[in-house]
Amino acid sequence: LKESKEPVIVISHQPIAGIYTIDNAVEIQNLLSVHASKIILAINGHAHVDQLIQVAGVTYLHLTSASYYWVGEKHAHLSMDADTHANYPSLTSTCPYAAVLFGILTLDRKQGKLTLTGRKSSWIGPSPLELGYSILSKEEQGLYLQPQISDRAIA
């Protein structure tokens, strides 16, 4: 980043800011914030949430999973037919989406705009909130834990 003359998009699997951050998130945020003017976006996916936040001048985007949210064995349930669950036993620990999710990022460097065109789906079976999944608060689940990738305009 120090030597880059071009704008940069930082891509990581696990979150650097927001929900479910890596252990040394603050250290990485501090390193990135020094170069905030060069960073268009920092993007990650691991948390399976739909969240956009700013920390110290850097915009961080969480992209949700393409197909499900993991709730674990404690919240195991049947969301599909018995044959599907027999073939894919791990499905009982997920809240799957009815349609695959994806987003399209478009960068317009002349106008200095980045847009994300997302996609919405629905839960197959109960949502994590309906199952009593408790790592996130009810408010956070309502805001960030949805079967969707939101449309966004990032300047």
Task: Please provide the spans of the model-predicted regions.
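His/acidic metal-ligating clusters that form di-metal
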Residues: L1-T59
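Binuclear metal-dependent phosphoesterase catalytic core
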Residues: Q51-A155
